[in-house]
Each structure stands twice: as C-alpha cells, then as structure tokens.
Amino acid sequence: MSTRTEAVKAYLLDLQDRICTALEQEDGNAHFVEDAWTRPAGGGGRTRVVENGAVIEKGGVNFSHVFGSNLPPSASAHRPELAGRGFEALGVSLVIHPHSPHVPTSHANVRFFIAEKEGEEPVWWFGGGFDLTPYYGVEEDCVHWHRVAERACAPFGDDVYPRYKAWCDSYFHLKHRDEPRGIGGLFFDDVNQWDFDTSFAFIRAIGDAFINAYLPIVRRRKAAAYTVQQREFQEFRRGRYVEFNLVYDRGTLFGLQSGGRTESILMSLPPQVRWGYDWKAAPGSEEARLTDYFLTDRDWLADN
C-alpha cells in the first residue's frame, strides 16, 4: 500500500468513527453494530448498521477497501483507456433513514480510486458528495444544507460549489420519472484537477462537513409529531430512493460488478417502502408542495 493510500485509509476510518459517534449521540438510543468482512478477490471493510433507534429507523455507515486486477465496467465506462488496469478503491458511504417523515433521509460518500499498470504512471482520482431527500420540505433546512456545502467548497475556488451542485442535481435524477430524488447538495467524480494534497484536502473538507450539514436539521425536526398519512407518504417517496439506487447509482453498480459484499451494498435501502399505482398527491397539499416547490431545479442560496 502506498503512502497516499495509507493516508486516505486512515482518514476514512477516522471519518467513519466520528460520524457514527455523532449520530449515536444525536439519536440517544441508537448503537451501530459493526460487521467486519473480507472480499475473496481482495480487500474488505467494516459495515456499521443501526436499526430501530429513537430517531434512526435504519442507517449504515460503511468503510470498504477493495482491490483487484481489472477495473469493473462501472468504473471504466467513462475512462475506457483504464480498462484492464489493476485497481484499489477506498471509501466511506452512508445512508440514514429516519423514522419521522419530517426528518430527511441523507446520503454521503467519499472515495478514492487508483488504477495501475506496470510500466505506466498510476492514475488516481477522488469522488463523493452528499445529498438530502426530504419528504416534507422546510426551506430553512434546504438553505442550511446548501450553505454548509458552499462553505466546504469555498477554499478551493468560487466555481467549485456551483459546478458540483449542478452535477448533483443532474446525477440524482430519476430519468424514467423525470424527477429529482431530493434537493441535492454536492456530487463529483474524477477529481484530480489539483495536485494530490489539494485534492485530498478537498475530500476531507466534504467528509467533515456532513455532520455539520445534517445534524442541525435532525435536531430541529426529530420531535415533530406526524400522522399515519404522512408516514405512508414517506414510504411512497422512499420508493423513488429504491428505484434510483438499484437502477442508476454508480456505487451500487460498482459494488455488485466488483464482487463486493451484497449486504453492505444494499444496506442503503430503506426498511419499509410502498408503491401505489399512478398515485398522485392532492393539488395544494403538503405532499404536492414537495414536488411543486422543493424538488425543482433551484438555487437555494440565491436569496439567502
């Protein structure tokens, strides 16, 4: 393992620890259970899952470090010149599904790839981001989420947040329904436009920002009462989350194609979900407001 890879791995393991601790403290009744695993083809990881906490219905914070002799198709599709190279991939990925429909689902990921071939220079890049999926949107929460994202990006250039915000909006879009999965945040891949130290600093800034972005929202909304109807709407919207993760998500596809651990890969799926045939929210309802007002292409910081 190279010095660079060792530094990234140490950071990711520490990030996993810090996020789990912060989520446990905010929940008050949750405890992550760790499941260490090995990958027969090379590598392994530690999956941490929580279920039936006071706030978190189901959540997972995964670390993985896998390697192999050939990049999977999902990793080389956009860079065909790397096909056939050996690879190492390290990352932390998390999804939090709260009980309450007033607390948004959150997702975050930071990852590092390095592709190597004998006699050639290694090719490395970082990827990741974080995004928010509310069920009953609150403008204050959306602005806060994007403000934290903007501040994390600011030291690396004025164009970084707008570029990766737009990429997030484009990526987390259900093409077959022509609708966003949530209100976005940041998404980026193939980050190596800076030198390694700057790129690594950027990834650390994004990883470290997640707790500051998410926990204040959880704290504000976790005690709000909700109805059976609101819970059913949450489960209906969770169906969109499942559709995206199984059809489009690069991390899911990479994990399955690289022979990753299925239980860890599918940990992102919510525990309860529903689909209703051609269901539509009543015009003017809070449920309709989600799609009419929040799940739109918006600049959340323009007037705030």
UniProtKB/Swiss-Prot annotation:
The segment annotated Important for dimerization runs over 241-276
InterPro entries attached to this UniProt entry = Coprogen_oxidase_aer (IPR001260), Coprogen_oxidase_aer_sf (IPR036406), Coprogen_oxidase_CS (IPR018375)
Show the GO MF annotations. Answer: coproporphyrinogen oxidase activity; metal ion binding; protein homodimerization activity
One GO biological process term: protoporphyrinogen IX biosynthetic process
Q: Which UniProt keywords apply?
A: Cytoplasm, Heme biosynthesis, Metal-binding, Oxidoreductase, Porphyrin biosynthesis
- Its EC number(s): 1.3.3.3
Q: Which GO terms describe its cellular component?
A: cytoplasm
Q: Which residues bind substrate?
A: 93, 109-111, 259-261
Keyword Magnesium in record: no
Per its record, the protein catalyses:
coproporphyrinogen III + O2 + 2 H(+) = protoporphyrinogen IX + 2 CO2 + 2 H2O
Q: Where does this protein chiefly localize?
A: cytoplasm
The record's annotation in PROSITE patterns points to: COPROGEN_OXIDASE (PS01021)
> What quaternary structure, including any partners, is listed in this protein's UniProt entry?
Homodimer.
Q: What does this protein do?
A: Involved in the heme biosynthesis. Catalyzes the aerobic oxidative decarboxylation of propionate groups of rings A and B of coproporphyrinogen-III to yield the vinyl groups in protoporphyrinogen-IX.
Under which name does UniProt file this protein? Oxygen-dependent coproporphyrinogen-III oxidase
State the species of origin: Pseudomonas syringae pv. tomato (strain ATCC BAA-871 / DC3000)
